[in-house]
C-alpha cells in the first residue's frame, strides 16, 4: 500500500524493483554475485528477501522464479525481403532497464505507416527506410538508456547512489533539464529523430 505501480528501491542488503500486476506483484530481486543461481532461487532466500521488503506474518505465494541473465542485442537490419522485425525481435535489452516495450510500439507505429503506404502503391523500398529510421534509435536511445537505467538500479556504492539521486533531483528542479529528460525517457525525442532520417 502506498507504492507506485512501478517501484525501484535501493537498500543495504540488495536492490529490487516491484511491478504491480492485476491481483499480484512482480518482484525483481538482485542477489549477490557470490551466490549460485540455485542458492539465489532457494525458497527460503526468496522468502527472506520478500520479508525484508514487506514484512508479513504469512509466507508469500511465489508463482514463478528464475534467474535472468542480462544481455543486449540488436539485428543488423530490421528487414530482409518480406521478413520484418520489430520490438524484441529487432532489439533486445535488459527488462530491468525498461524501454523495450515502448521501443517496440514505436517500431510498430513506424512500420505500420510504411506498410500502409506500400498497400496504397508505394515502393517496397520503404521497408529499408523503416530499418534506417528505427535501428539507430534503438542503438542510441533504447539500448543505451536501458543500460544506463539498469546500471543505476544495480549500483551498490552509497556514494554513487547519492550522486545519482542528486543528479535526478537537479533535473526535477530545472524546467529545461526536466523537459529534456522527459522527451528522451518517453522516447518522443527518438520518434522525432527517426522522422528526420531519409
Residue ranges, per PLM feature:
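Core Rossmann-like FAD-binding/catalytic domain of the broad FAD-dependent monooxygenase superfamily
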Residues: 1-198
Amino acid at each position: 500500500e502506498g507504492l507506485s505501480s512501478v517501484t525501484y528501491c535501493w537498500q543495504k542488503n540488495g536492490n529490487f524493483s516491484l511491478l504491480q500486476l492485476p491481483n499480484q506483484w512482480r518482484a525483481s530481486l538482485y542477489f549477490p554475485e557470490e551466490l549460485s543461481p540455485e542458492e539465489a532461487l532457494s525458497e527460503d532466500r526468496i522468502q527472506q528477501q520478500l520479508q525484508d521488503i514487506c514484512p508479513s506474518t504469512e509466507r508469500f505465494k511465489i508463482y514463478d522464479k528464475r534467474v535472468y541473465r542480462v544481455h543486449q542485442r540488436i539485428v543488423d537490419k530490421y528487414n530482409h525481403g518480406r521478413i520484418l522485425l520489430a520490438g524484441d525481435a529487432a532489439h533486445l535489452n535488459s527488462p530491468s532497464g525498461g524501454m523495450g516495450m515502448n521501443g517496440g510500439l514505436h517500431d510498430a507505429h513506424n512500420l505500420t505507416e510504411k506498410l500502409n503506404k506500400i498497400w496504397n502503391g508505394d515502393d517496397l523500398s520503404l521497408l529499408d527506410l523503416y530499418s534506417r529510421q528505427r535501428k539507430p534509435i534503438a542503438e542510441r536511445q533504447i539500448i543505451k538508456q536501458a543500460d544506463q537505467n539498469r546500471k543505476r538500479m544495480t549500483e551498490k556504492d552509497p556514494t554513487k547512489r547519492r550522486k545519482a539521486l542528486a543528479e535526478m533531483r537537479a533535473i526535477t528542479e530545472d524546467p529545461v533539464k526536466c523537459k529534456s529528460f522527459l522527451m528522451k525517457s518517453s522516447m518522443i525525442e527518438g520518434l522525432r529523430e527517426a522522422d528526420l532520417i531519409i
